[in-house]
A protein has these predicted regions:
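Hydrophobic residues embedded in beta-strands of well-ordered beta-sheets
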Residues: 29-30, 78, 101-106
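Short beta-strand-centered aromatic/proline hotspots
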Residues: 11, 18-35
Length: 146
């Protein structure tokens, strides 16, 4: 994953799987904050496309539920699990396959009478954050926790 593909506040990991939140992005480098359990910055970590590149954080049901998404057991079929998020005027549905299946993610956005569905080949936290920002849900995207 290249640094310029990311945005401020995106969640990434280092090569050891330690999650961090991006705080600075350049053309080929990025800086991420290491947060403690209370969400306080403990230190910063530098990433570079040529030496120490960032890795994506795999999206899971646990991460979704930490961020206000609700698991819909009645919509689960063929190994696909569904979660929903509603803030009053916007309703989102997200489908993730079982761990054994391909890492495909489907997001359904509904607002008033409009709806839009997008399929992604990978289920990563930063991809969900980017899509939430496209829907105008910047606060939800920027304040995600892993």
């Amino acid at each position: 994953m290249k640094c310029k593909e990311l945005m401020i506040y995106d969640w990434i990991e280092d090569r050891n799987g330690f999650p961090m939140k991006l705080s600075l992005i350049g053309e080929t480098h990025a800086c991420a904050a290491v947060l403690d359990v209370a969400g306080v910055v403990g230190s910063y970590w530098d990433f570079d496309d040529n030496f120490n590149e960032p890795y994506p954080v795999k999206l899971s049901g646990e991460i979704l539920e930490k961020n206000g998404w609700v698991f819909n057991e009645e919509k689960m079929n063929y190994g696909v699990k569904c979660w929903s998020y509603c803030d009053g005027e916007v309703k989102l549905s997200l489908s993730l396959p079982d761990e054994d299946d391909k890492e495909r993610m489907v997001i359904l956005y509904e607002r008033f009478l409009d709806s839009d569905s997008i399929v992604y080949d990978n289920a990563y936290v930063h991809i969900l954050q980017h899509q939430l920002r496209c829907y105008g849900l910047n606060e939800l995207a920027d304040n995600m926790v892993v």
